């Protein structure tokens, strides 16, 4: 292998918003990384269904583009 061409591969601490922490290896320059969802709290792995609030986004879309519904694309 050539010298000084490969990135520094080190252990980093991954912190989830649920409080779970684990260690992995990465080429990131930081020593810690924050994620919103991990295998300890993701619905696919836990088997629990999580309701995502999309009503606010739909209402915002309708307010922005709702007046265009009656008009034709001509």
Swiss-Prot record:
Q: Answer yes or no on keyword rRNA-binding.
A: yes
* A single GO cellular-component term on record: ribonucleoprotein complex
What's a BP term from Gene Ontology annotated to this protein?
translation
Please name the PROSITE patterns in this protein's record: RIBOSOMAL_L31
Describe cofactor binding as the record notes it: Binds 1 zinc ion per subunit.
InterPro entries noted in UniProt? Ribosomal_bL28/bL31-like_sf, Ribosomal_bL31, Ribosomal_bL31_A, Ribosomal_bL31_sf
Key words, A-Z: Metal-binding, Ribonucleoprotein, Ribosomal protein, RNA-binding, rRNA-binding, Zinc
Pfam annotation, one family:
Ribosomal_L31
Residues that bind Zn(2+): 16, 18, 38, 41
Extract the NCBIfam families matched here: L31 (TIGR00105), PRK00019.1 (NF000612), PRK00528.1 (NF001809)
Q: Tell me how this protein assembles.
A: Part of the 50S ribosomal subunit.
Question: Under which name does UniProt file this protein?
Answer: Large ribosomal subunit protein bL31
**UniProt source species:** Dechloromonas aromatica (strain RCB)
Q: Which gene encodes it?
A: rpmE
